[in-house]
Regions:
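Primary detection of the long, small/polar-rich alpha-helical "axial" segments characteristic
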Residues: 1-473
């Protein structure tokens, strides 16, 4: 027996300290609900749980991003719904104007409403926005830049590659011409390159700069072929330069229409030849005239057919693979048009880098829809307007269908993200959360050990007192 060192008390105290530490940890876990409260509790488990927390937070934010994307799409689709309603109304007006019972005054009134609806379409295009971001003015579509302001790319199809295209207009499309034949003299051609009116039998016929050959022909046909006319035409002289002449004795003039003053010659080249070959769009697209069929040749044995359609200042190139570009051309010019990807709206619909969804909303206005120069002042032009508005309605419907597909995809993405977050949260719970029942068993065990340890420590401290009995004896 020793009195300098109470080994039993030291052992009991040491064990009691360990029991107290275990009891403290158990109390901490029970009060917090977490198995891991610090890195020392489970270093690997802590690292895993933190990565899971990061992923869960990213998935939840991605779900909110997708919901915001749906809001954007619904905003654009709502505006397009109204645009399509206006196009339907304009088509209805065109059908009305095509009826032969209408007078010129009736058609003029109809034209006024069409013009107002066109202006409203342009207003919707420039003002529709979400969170101050314009949606229908082309900023959410692929961007394009032209180094010549006389040639501007208005719209392009999805199959158009992101690269540079060289566009050459060797002859600008000319407006329709009218020819006046004066008895006993030579013929003179009057090129109507401006908005003007022709007075026939005290009745004014309006000819617009954008009127096609058929438009002019129909207006003159309805007025009669041989009429008394007073007109100041622009006459093309021998040197090809325009001259102004006034017809003094204008009775008995035969008023006829001729073909366009000049055919238009268009050439488009993709500067990336390998890309052009891979896409099958050929290295060049060229054509002349109205609705001219052209052949695209890249190499021997490779040939495709495309259509170059010219309507006033607008040139549309389309091939059999729906490679489609629409340009606005002002006179003879050459330009390099660069197509970029900078415009689309990329929605972050995943928790990690690169998990994005591209949303493209094409520019929607009267230029892209082709309704800017529509007129229904004659039966012929009204008939043509019906087709123009039908095509515009189909184009808007196609855009709305694409937006609907975007929305359906985003809704499924939200469901998928929510399920992923749910499953990952469940996995995190298994790693991080404490099993309360099991931990309560541990706590009870440590509590009993603590109480018994205190009792045994008291007993160990009393043992040295037994030495006094030896000294007393």
């Amino acid at each position: 027996m020793r009195i300098n060192h109470n080994i039993s008390a030291l052992k009991a105290c040491n064990i009691l300290g360990k029991t107290g530490g275990a009891l403290d940890k158990s109390l901490e876990r029970l009060s917090s609900g977490f198995r891991i409260n610090r890195a020392a509790d489970d270093a690997a488990g802590l690292a895993i749980s933190e990565k899971m927390k990061t992923q869960i937070a990213g998935l939840e934010q991605a779900s909110r991003n997708a919901a915001d994307g749906i809001s954007v799409i619904q905003t654009a689709e709502g505006a397009l719904d109204e645009v399509e309603a206006m196009l339907q109304r304009m088509r209805e007006l065109s059908v009305q104007a095509a009826n032969g019972v209408n007078t010129d005054e009736d058609r003029a009134a109809i034209q006024d409403e069409i013009d107002q609806l066109n202006e409203e379409i342009n207003r919707v295009s420039t003002t529709t926005e979400f969170n101050t971001k314009k949606l229908l003015n082309g900023t959410v579509d692929r961007r394009s830049y032209s180094d010549n302001e006389k040639i501007q790319l208005i719209s392009l199809s999805d199959s158009v590659a992101i690269t540079e295209y060289a566009l050459s207009v060797t002859k600008a499309p000319q407006p329709a011409q009218v020819e006046t034949t004066i008895p006993g003299s030579t013929s003179k051609s009057a090129a109507l390159g401006y908005n003007g009116k022709i007075a026939i039998n005290e009745k004014e016929i309006e000819i617009k700069e954008t009127d096609t050959l058929n438009d002019v022909y129909e207006k003159l046909r309805e007025a009669g072929s041989t009429v008394d006319i007073n007109v100041t035409p622009t006459v093309e002289g021998a040197d090809g330069e325009p001259e102004t002449a006034t017809i003094a004795d204008a009775t008995g003039l035969l008023f006829e229409t001729t073909d366009k003053g000049d055919d238009a010659s268009i050439e488009i080249y993709c500067t990336n030849e390998e890309l052009a070959k891979a896409l099958g769009i050929s290295s060049g697209i060229s054509g002349a005239g109205v609705d001219a069929e052209v052949t695209l040749d890249y190499t021997t044995g490779f040939a495709r057919t495309a259509t170059v359609s010219i309507d006033g200042d607008y040139v549309t190139v389309t091939d059999v693979d729906d490679f489609k570009m629409k340009f606005k051309v002002q006179g003879e010019a050459e330009a390099t048009v660069t197509v970029l990807k900078a415009g689309p709206m990329d929605l972050q619909i995943g928790a990690n880098e690169g998990q994005t969804m591209e949303v493209r909303i094409p520019k929607v206005d009267t230029d892209t829809l082709g309704t800017a120069v529509v007129n229904v002042n004659t039966q012929e032009s009204a008939q043509k307007a019906i087709t123009i508005f039908e095509n515009a309605i189909q184009e808007v419907s196609a855009i709305r269908a694409k937006l609907g597909a975007y929305q359906n995809r985003l809704e499924h993405s939200i469901n998928s993200l929510n399920i992923s977050a749910e499953n990952l949260t469940e996995a995190l719970s298994r790693v991080e959360d404490v099993d309360m029942a099991k931990e309560m068993v541990t706590y009870t065990q440590q509590q009993v050990l603590s109480q018994s340890g205190n009792a045994m420590l008291a007993q160990a401290n009393e043992r040295p007192q037994s030495i006094l009995s030896l000294l007393q004896s």
